Amino acid sequence: MEPGKEKEVEAPGELNQKPRPSTRSSTTNRQPKMKRRKKDLEELKKEVVMDDHKLTLDELSAKYSVDLTKGLSILEAQDILFQNGPNVLTPPPTTPEWVKFCRQLFGGFSLLLWTGACLCFLAYGIHVNYYKENANKDNLYLGIVLSAVVIITGCFSYYQEAKSSKIMESFKNMVPQQALVIRDGEKMQINVRDVVLGDLVEVKGGDQIPADIRVISAQGCKVDNSSLTGESEPQSRCPDCTHENPLETRNIIFFSTNCVEGTARGIVIATGDYTVMGRIASLTSGLQMGKTPIATEIEHFIHLITAVAVFLGVSFFWLSIILGYTWLDAVIFLIGIIVANVPEGLLATVTVCLTLTAKRMARKNCLVKNLEAVETLGSTSTICSDKTGTLTQNRMTVAHLWFDKTVYEADTSEEQTTGKTFPKSSDTWFYLARIAGLCNRADFKPHQESVPIAKRATTGDASESALLKFIEQSYNPVSEMRQKNPKVAEIPFNSTNKYQMSIHLLEDNSEAHVLLMKGAPERIFDFCSSFLLNGQEYPMDEEMKMDFQNAYIELGGLGERVLGFCFLNLPSNFSKGFQFNTDELNFPMENLCFAGLISMIDPPRTAVPDAVSKCRSAGIKVIMVTGDHPITAKAIAKSVGIISEGNDTAEDIAARLNIPISQVNNKSVKAIVVHGSELKDMESQQLDDILKSYKEIVFARTSPQQKLIIVEGCQRLGAIVAVTGDGVNDSPALKKADIGIAMGITGSDVSKQAADMILLDDNFASIVTGVEEGRLIFDNLKKSIAYTLTSNIPEITPFLLFIILSIPLPLGTITILCIDLGTDMVPAISLAYESPESDIMKRLPRNPKTDNLVNNRLIGMAYGQIGMIQALAGFFTYFVILAENGFKPLDLLGIRLYWDDTQLNDLEDSYGQQWTYEQRKVVEFTCQTAFFISIVIVQWADLIICKTRRNSLFKQGMKNKILIFGLLEETVLAAFLSYVPGMDVSLRMYPLKINWWFCALPYSVLIFVYDEIRKLIIRRRPGGWLEKETYY
C-alpha cells in the first residue's frame, strides 16, 4: 500500500460499507433527516445487490487489498475498524418505560375519562366560586374517582404489557461470540465485534458465522440458513459461484447463520448493519406499525359517545337558557350532562375482558405481548404463514421407501402412531437398512434412553439424523449394528461428488469388507451394474432403469429429498487389515448393486390440515410464504390443504392435459405457486391481481423484502393480515403485519421482538384457537358494552328532567358512581366468559369498515329502547315513593327551587303537611336510593338479554357461572349499600321498604319479553327490517 493512501474497503451495490463520516457540530435540518430515513427504508425494501460472489479470487483479493493466505495486517484491520466501526447491529430504538406508561394513562378511552374528570373539577370550581361554603362537592368526588379509575386501569394495563416484555427477555440468550481470523499470516481468536471488512476468516462446524463472507476454500462445509432463508436442510458451501442470486449461491455464508459441519475459509465482504441480516434488522426496526383494529374501534366509540354527549349537553344548555336559568347554571348543567354520558366503568371492563382472554389464550399456547392483539387475531382475514416449523414439524423424517420395485409410505406423524408399515421381512430391506444405518455420520446424543426415538437429539445433519431415527425404529439399534460392522474407511459427502461412501468389516465374516454408498440417486445409479429384487441380485436392465426413473420422478415430485443406496461386497483380497486409501482409491468403485431409494421431507404437523380447513370455513385466506424450493412448498401446501384437492395450478393442468401452459384456461385455475424471481420484477398492480384472482397461493423462494411486499399487498386490498414466522427473514413482515406471530421454541430473538404474539408450541393449529378466542371476545365486548351503555339513559334522564321539569333530583352523582363502578362492573366482565352463540368459525371475518364494535344499532338499542324502559322503571319507583310521602307527581313540577332552599323549613306537600329542609333531603336521598335499586333490578334483565344477540336465552341457557355470580353480586352489593348503617352519611343511601324493590320488577319482565320477541322475529326473518335496525 502506498503511504497516505486509504485502503479501498467498499462492498458493491446495496451492501456498500463506507467509512463513517466525521461528526458535524452544526445542527442539521430535521426535514432532510426524515426524508433520508424514509428513503433509507425504501432502499432497504429493495433486493440485495452484490457481485462479490461472481468475482474471481484474484479480483476479490484486489478489491479488498487482502492477501488470501496471510489476511490483513493488524494495522490495516485497526484502521478499517476505526473507519467503519464495530461489527455489531445497531440496536433498534426502544420506547422508554415512562412513554409506555403515559400511553396507557392517556391513550384511547382514558382520554375521554380524563376529559370527564377535568370537566368535573371545572364544575366544582364554578360551584365553589359561586356558592362559597354551600358548594356541592359531588363533582369534586366524581372528578377524583374518574382520575383514580384511569390511573388504576392504566397501571394494570402497563403491568400486563411489562409482564409480557419480561417473558420476552427470558427468551434471550446472550453469549459472547468469538471469531477465528488470520492476520499477518497468524491465526488469532478475536471478539466478533472486531471483525472487519476484508478479514480472512476461518469457520468450522458449530461456529456462528461472524459476518457475510465470500468462501475461498471449503472442506465438507454445510451451513444452516433456516433462520435467514427458511430452508430446513443444511446447505453445502464451496468456492464456486452457483447462482446469480447472492442469497442462493453456494460461495457466500451469511452473518448469524450456523456452520453445522466441515470447515471453510473466506473473506469478509460485509459487517454489522451492512450484512444481509443487518439490513433485515434495520428494515424491521424502521417499519412503522399502524393502529390495531380494537384501537380504531375504541377511537370510533369515543367519537360516537362524545358526539352524543356534546349534542345532549349543548341542546340542554340552550334549553336551560330558554327556561330562564342563569348562564352559570346552564354551564354547570352542560358539564353535568357531558360527564353523565361518560361510562366510567367501561375502560376497566374492556381492559379486564381483554386480559382474561389473553390469559385464556396463554393456556392454549398463545402468548400475547400486547392486549389489543387479542382482538386483532379475531379480525384476521388473511394469514401469511411460513412453512418450516410452523406448518411442518421442523425435522426431516423418512417419508417413502422404494425397493423391490415398489413405493412404500413411512409413518411421518409426530407421535409415530399411524401404524403405516412396509415388508420388513424382505431381504432387500435388510440390505437397505444396513446401508442407511452404517453409511451415516449422525449419532444420538448420550443419556436419552427414556426419550422417544423420534424426539431424541442427534449430532449430524437433518437427512442423516432422519435415517438414523428411522433405522433405529424400523430395524435394529444402530449402535449395535456399528459395533458389529466397524468402519475402516470413508469418503464424506461433498457437493462435487454428491455421494458418501464408507467401508465396513462384515459381521458374519470378520475377514471380509463391504463398501456402502448413498447419495444423489442419479449419481448412485451410475455406479451400479446390478440391482436387488426380493433379496436376489440381478443384472441391470432397461426395465429397471425405467422403474428407477419413474420412482425418482414420483418421489421428487412430492417435494421430498431423495437418496439412492447401493453396496459392493469387496473381493477376498481386500481382507482385514487392508489399508484403504480414499485419496488414491486403491479399491473398486464400480459395478455396485443398487438397493433402493429413501426419500425424506419435513412433514406437516398432524393438526395443521384440520386447522387450515377451519380457516377456510371461517373465510380466512391462508397463504404460504416460504424461502424453500417451489416443489417442496407446493407439496406441503397440498398436504396441509392450502392448495386443496381439485384446485390445480396452471402447471398441473397443463401436465394432466398434456398441453402447453399458454393454452390453459385461466378461469379454471384457482391455485398458483409464485417464485421469488417472478415477484422480484413484479409491479404492485400485478401482485394485487394475483392476490385478488387466486384463492390458494404459495410464494416460494422469497426474500425477506418480498415477504414484506406480500404483506403490504394484502393490506392494500383491505385485509387484516396475520403473519407467522420464526426466522430473522420473517421479522420485517412480522412487524408490518396487523398481527405478527412468532414461534416460541424455534423462533429467533429478532422474530420474537418483532411479533405481537408468540406460539409457545410452534403449532399453526394454535393460531386457529387464537382466531376463535379473538372473534369471541369481539362478540362478548359488544355485549358487555351494550349492557354498560344501557344504564346511561336511566342515569342521564333524571338530570334532564331535573332541568326541564324542575323536580327534585331523582339520582345523585354518587349513586351513578355506585352503578358504574360498583353494581355494573362484575356483570359486565362476566359477559367475557359467555360461550359463542353459534359456530363463530363458520362465518366470514368481520369487515372493519362496516362491522364496528359500537355501531348506531347498538347505541339505538341501548339508549333508545332498553335504556328508555329502564328510565321508566326508575321514575315509576321515584314517583311512587314521593306519592307515598305526600307529594303527587303533578305537584312536583317546578318545585325544585323551593325544595333546595336551605332556609325554607315549611314546604307543604299535596296534603298540606309541612316539610323541613332536612326532612325533604331524607326523602330525596331515599328516592335516589330507590332509583338506584330499580336500575339494578332492570339491569338483571339487561344482563340476561345481552347474553345473546340472536339466539333465544332458552337455547343459550344459563351455563355461565360467572354471570350468575354477577347477578348475585350486584344484588347483594345494592342491598349492602342500602341497608348497612352509616351509608346514609357517607353515600347518602337510605334503607328501603321491601315492597319498593318490586316496583321495577314488571319493567324487568317487560325488557326480557320484548327482547325475546325481537330476537324471534330476527331469526324468523333474517335480513329483514328489524335485523337491519336492531341487530348490533
Swiss-Prot record:
- The transmembrane residues are 97-117, 142-162, 299-318, 331-348, 782-801, 812-832, 853-875, 928-947, 961-979, 995-1015
- Which of the residues are on side Cytoplasmic? 1-96, 163-298, 349-781, 833-852, 948-960, 1016-1032
Q: How does it sit in the membrane?
A: Multi-pass membrane protein
- Gene Ontology biological-process entries: establishment of localization in cell; fertilization; flagellated sperm motility; regulation of cellular pH; regulation of membrane potential; sodium ion transport; spermatogenesis
Q: Which tissues does it occur in?
A: Expressed at high levels in the testis and at low levels in the epididymis.
Instruction: Outline the segment boundaries, as ranges, of region: Interaction with phosphoinositide-3 kinase.
Output: 91-93
Question: What is known about its subunit structure?
Answer: The sodium/potassium-transporting ATPase is composed of a catalytic alpha subunit, an auxiliary non-catalytic beta subunit and an additional regulatory subunit.
What family does the entry list?
Belongs to the cation transport ATPase (P-type) (TC 3.A.3) family. Type IIC subfamily.
Q: What is this protein called?
A: Sodium/potassium-transporting ATPase subunit alpha-4
Natural source organism = Mus musculus
UniProt lists the gene as Atp1a4
